[in-house]
Amino acid sequence: MKFTVNQKELLNNLLIVNKAVSNKNIQPLLSGIYLEATEDNKLIIRGTDMELGIESEVSAFVEESGKIVLPSKYFVEIVRKLPMMDLELSTEENSQIKIIYGSSEIKLNYFEGSEYPSIHDFEGECVLKIKGDDLVNAISLSQVVVSTDMSRPIFTGILLEIKNDKLNFVSSDTHRLCYTYIENIEKNVDRWESIVPAKSLKEVAYIIHEDEEIEIHITSNRILFKSGNIKVTSRLIEGKFVNYEQVIPKEFSTDINIIKKSLLDSLERAFVLTRDEIKSKLNTVKFNIKEKVLIISSRASEVGDIYEEIPIYLQGKEIELGFNGKYLIEILRNIDGEEISIKLNDPQSPGIIKGNQGNEKFIYLILPVRLQ
């Protein structure tokens, strides 16, 4: 195998593909990055941990085709530190690849590439086409309330559901739930449900080109994303997601509009006092909603108290209840827009947080906590 490739292009694509590689994998082959030089002057770069797979194509001048696997831990760092110039890579008979840059060279041991898992194109039973920026936004909103508890795997994923001409995204960590959606999608089915690992979607959001159309293929156990010269494939999570439509309240007795930054700043100040008591006190923040003001208070027994008033516009009843301040902070940091709406019923029932002023394509549901 012998080819010439630009250092910057090679590095950019290695950094993308390397997100699917685990250096802790007990199989040496899966701790590496697959390189294939093709006769039509392309360099195919691939990484996988058998759960997530990423493949990219780079233009190269190929003199001799071939395929090998290089240890990602060393290869990526070496390429990162090479000068920005054309690099010449060629395999030698002693299972080493020579990397020539200017008048210098580095040699690395490699594995044969014939046994490395492939990333097949497949025609999904469900095929979608959506805008890249819409997909990135939906993933960003959803992933903040995903569980890390592997004993309940469906909550470590995000539900992708086609229903009523929309692509719905639903996630939950059992304390909170997020619902958002994308309209104006091209699709070949009217109904579909799949649960995609949140960590896979996080990488998709990082990798894809936001200004491009994204093609998605889904089968019963895998999903494939195509964006420009990049393909990402992931296994799906087995199981049935919770009936989120039954969980989200439809009517409310209390509805407040509030400036998001004012609420977030206040909660972050309260968190400074209570963060060392999270495990024992659930980081509880009291909300006392009056006619024109939200009173936020919190107490840390060994640190002190906080009491703040924030102007609001209230429709409905006054109410007093508690929330986990950390959970609220994580949600608010993830919302764009100046103003939000918080809708409530009673101190034991879930409330919801929505955007205002045209930023209304999402709902966060959050459970209150019992006040001491």
Model regions: which residues?
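Structural preference for solvent-exposed beta-strand-turn elements
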Residues: 1-372
